[in-house]
Amino acid sequence: MIKKFDTTTQEVLLELEKTQKEFWNISRTTAEFLYNFIVDAKSQSVVEVGTSNGYSGIWLGKALKQTGGKLMTIEFYDKRLDVAKENFEKCGVADIITPRKGDAAT
């Protein structure tokens, strides 16, 4: 379990980790690295290209909650973006995340 997160977030992340290959999610090790990097750097603004199901966005959002920052995340597929938005809501980070429909080239 991820002791620094609430029970709901822990459960959501564990469920999303089961779909890591299907949704091309980053590994937990990478997620923890990014989380710590954002907190240590006191980042205020982060852009993520490739929202997928929201796994990495949850980690980034939780870190940015600590620093008072915000995340903009971009996803091409509507279905994945909708799933990510639901996961952001469940994990309490939707208020600092701006999800956008688009691709990396635009």
Question: Where do the protein language model's features map onto the residues?
Answer:
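A short alpha-helical cap/connector motif
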Residues: M1-T106
